[in-house]
Amino acid sequence: MSALLGLRPEVQDTCISLGLMLLFVLFVGLARVIARQQLHRPVVHAFVLEFLATFQLCCCTHELQVLSEQDSAHPTWTLTLIYFFSLVHGLTLVGTASNPCGVMMQMILGGMSPEMGAVRLLAQLVSALCSRYCISALWSLSLTKYHYDERILACRNPIHTDMSKAIIIEAICSFIFHSALLHFQEVRTKLRIHLLAALITFLAYAGGSLTGALFNPALALSLHFPCFDELFYKFFVVYWLAPSVGVLMMILMFSFFLPWLHNNQMTNKKE
């Protein structure tokens, strides 16, 4: 602690924010271990693990936004953190989606029952709201000059383009990410996690300045809940409907349209 106090205020703030993010990861990791040992009912087990995974993702992303403001002159710093914590989430949250669109994809493709999907969706939404209360309590302690309670209560609109472009950006980001998620399943786990982290970083770089490139309805609800209250229709369409449409388009293309096109070509060749 004395070593931390000897640093410049800006460096102190950065270290505190990074420390909080690592504490979230350690807390959730410990809670997941306990849940695996103590919870044996599949539904309760799935709910708790999905709740914890979404909680970690949302809390870390809240703090990541703070870090991006601390060194806004160097955008590569933010991208580096996005890549690093995407790796951390990928390694520590195995077996969970932390994204309603991911659950929807699994249900449509038959990898998850509707009942289990509903349980996971409920866990994600409840966790997204709980993470806001946790972050609000932490920020009220004013551990850094960027931590203040009013910050989480205000609507900080992340949409910096017209609505039609915002919808397209979120839909395309969701399409690309879930396409990779589907087609990287056969890739070795360690390599897959790096590839997905790199893709998330690229999408954040490409669309982050316009919409935040969230492509995750639960995360959007946690980060921008006051905006959903004030501008519900706009935020519902951009951050909930558009990513869902992106996933549906991806499933239609890779599961129906491309196989149909391939079968037609094979039939024509035989004729």
UniProtKB/Swiss-Prot annotation:
It comes from Mus musculus (Mouse). Residues 36-41, 98-166, 216-234 are lumenal. Signal peptide: none annotated. The chain crosses the membrane at residues 15-35, 42-62, 77-97, 167-187, 195-215, 235-255. A motif (NPA) lies at residues 216-218. The keyword Transmembrane applies. The NPC motif is essential for oligomerization and water permeability function. Changing residue 101 to A: Does not affect endoplasmic reticulum localization. Does not affect plama membrane localization. Reduces oligomerization. Impairs water permeability. Keywords: Cell membrane, Cytoplasmic vesicle, Disulfide bond, Endoplasmic reticulum, Membrane, Repeat, Transmembrane, Transmembrane helix, Transport. Channel protein that facilitates the transport of water, glycerol and hydrogen peroxide across membrane of cell or organelles guaranteeing intracellular homeostasis in several organes like liver, kidney and brain. In situation of stress, participates in endoplasmic reticulum (ER) homeostasis by regulating redox homeostasis through the transport of hydrogen peroxide across the endoplasmic reticulum membrane thereby regulating the oxidative stress through the NADPH oxidase 2 pathway. Homodimer; disulfide-linked. Homotetramer. Can also form homomultimer. GO terms for cellular component: cell surface; cytoplasm; cytoplasmic vesicle membrane; endoplasmic reticulum; endoplasmic reticulum membrane; plasma membrane. It catalyses: H2O(in) = H2O(out); glycerol(in) = glycerol(out); H2O2(out) = H2O2(in). SUPFAM superfamilies: Aquaporin-like (SSF81338). Highly expressed in the S1 proximal tubule segment,. Expressed in the testis, kidney, and liver. Weakly expressed in the heart, brain, and muscle. Highly expressed in the testis. Expressed in the proximal tubule of the cortex of 8-day-old mouse kidney. Expressed in retina specifically at retinal Mueller glial cells. Expressed in brain. Expressed abundantly at the choroid plexus but also expressed weakly in the parenchyma. Expressed at the capillary endothelium in the cerebral white matter. Expressed in adult testis, in the elongated spermatids (ES) and in residual bodies inside Sertoli cells. Its main location: endoplasmic reticulum. This is Aquaporin-11. InterPro entries: AQP11/12_channel, Aquaporin-like, Aquaporin_11, Aquaporin_11/12, MIP. The keyword Secreted does not apply. It holds the Pfam family MIP. GO terms for biological process: endosomal lumen acidification; glycerol transmembrane transport; hydrogen peroxide transmembrane transport; intracellular oxygen homeostasis; intracellular water homeostasis; kidney development; negative regulation of epithelial cell proliferation; negative regulation of ERAD pathway. The lineage of its organism: Eukaryota, Metazoa, Chordata, Craniata, Vertebrata. Belongs to the MIP/aquaporin (TC 1.A.8) family. AQP11/AQP12 subfamily. A motif (NPC) lies at residues 99-101. One of its GO terms (molecular function) is water channel activity.
